[in-house]
Structure formats: structure tokens, C-alpha cells
């Protein structure tokens, strides 16, 4: 399916811009003061929500700039190992809803690494994402191969920490580990071909 939001954003000078499924985009955080005009253009292009994945470098200043540009601001700390896994799990229902709404721009400091992890979490743990809707991972490619250790570490940490109550909250069945392994394997297999 065509991602018209991504197509409209391609006209703008956004570093590391990439599509997210058929309803969003991702790239670098536009937090520098020189990017204020760009946030307004992103809004004009149809983005309604900025999803900030930064952890320690997250600031309220960027939140204000986003609101001043007429956009909604959402934050979830995502990384490969430092953010507490329970914090991430608690945020997943909201995070999945933000992506389901569409018209979002997901951002991290460098544009691709944390967003790779985030869209992998969405693909592997959100029950409404079809098995064949594998996201393209762009930030973890190095010298002709996919470097999946950071992504696998975070996916495994979430799976290992899920309680029966978490599974219910996320709409996942008991015994989800088999489907988790199937999706994780498929994610890495598809992305190893580029």
C-alpha cells in the first residue's frame, strides 16, 4: 500500500527520512532551533503527531516547539538496553494506538536506530499487524549485513518480562512465545535481504 504521507514529506529536507508502514514516517528529531520552520512544514504536509523516542536527551523544549507548530507531541523512551523494560511495556498500548492512528512522524536523535527498534516492537507485539507487513529496518545495516543484536536484545527483554496481565492488556494470547519467535525470525529474515 502507498504511503502518501511519506511521499509528501520527501519534498522536505528531513535527515534519514523513511516510511513507517503505510501511514507514518520516521527520521531525525527536528529539535534544533534552526528546524522550527521545518516542524511547521511537516504539519502542513499532513503530520498530526510527533512521537519522540529519545531517552536521556529528551527535553520539554522540543515538546513546546512541536506544540507551537500545531502538532501533538507524544513521548516513549525506546532504546536497546538502558530503558527499564517495565517502563516500555507499560507504554506499549499507548504507543500502538499512536501508530494505529497514523499521520505521525517518529523521531530519534539519529533517525534510524531507535526507530528500527520501535517499529520492530510494533510488528512483533501488536496483534493487529499482519504477519506479512514486515517493516524495513534501515539503521542497523552495516557493511552489507543486518546487525540485529540490539533489536533482538530489546525484543527478547520485552518477551521475557511480559506477565499474563501484560499479555491480556496487549491483546496477546497465552503461549505467545511461539508467535513471538516466528515473527522475530521473519523480521530478521526479510530484512537480511537488501
Pin down the residues of each PLM region:
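Cys-dependent protein tyrosine phosphatase-like superfamily
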Residues: 1-106, 110, 117-194
